[in-house]
Amino acid sequence: MTIEQSPTHSDDVRNVYDGFGRVYGSVWGPNIHYGYWENDADDSSVEVATDRLTDLMISGLDAQAGQRVLDIGCGIGHPARRLVRTSDVDVVGITISHIQAAEATEHTAEAGLSDRATFQYADAMDMPFPDGSFDAAWAFESMWHMPDRGQVLSEAARVLRPGGRLAVADVIQREPITPEGRVVLDHVCENYGVSSLGTVDEYRTALAANGFVDVEIRDITDNVIRTLGLMADAFETVRDKLADVVGKEQADSLIDFVRRFGSIPESGYVYLTAVRA
């Protein structure tokens, strides 16, 4: 059974990232996503590990020089800029946070990449692009915020050209729900702009239903789950600053539930690639 909540409104997700996004960035860095560690002995820094996960996405996307890539849920654009530099592509990023779009645009100008990467406010379930506008697309930890993943995949298929590649990194439900897990997952869904946690089987079904083929799904939970404990530790160092932004009760709850989310067996993570038929 999948953990489901009432459909997340755009305002819920926007408020999460607008509310403490800058505090998050001050302790975690510019990558608003998990890190990837090769094994238990890997002592890479958060910066190295988060860039490594970006590089995994870049490799799977396999975008070619000069192609146009859509970043679905772009955050402040750090992975997009890395993609531009690595693959010599043009990127269009979309987000439902005006603040994130502005920050991404500012940071991209500072990096001298404004002619290669642009960012705008848009709804991933109703994209403002013509059919066949992009050669490739990725969704980097944005899908669990979507009220209807199938609709996002339908839109991705629509704006991708035939043969276009899709890469997704997403938090999923890995195991059947236990009573303890339900408490944690319900709290995460209700308080942090998360609509639901899907499963691998649900992804396979939704991808096939929307015309994607050559689907490859890799469970990388063991490589990324360390993120949550480290993130809780990082938030702990700025607890007072976080409390100033979201309130003491919410700050305490955030730190507690991030740590607990990383310790329950239901908490999983997948990296997948597919091709638009």
Model-derived segments and spans:
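Short, glycine-/aromatic-enriched active-site segment of Class I SAM-dependent methyltransferases
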Residues: 172-194
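Short alpha-helix
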Residues: 195-211
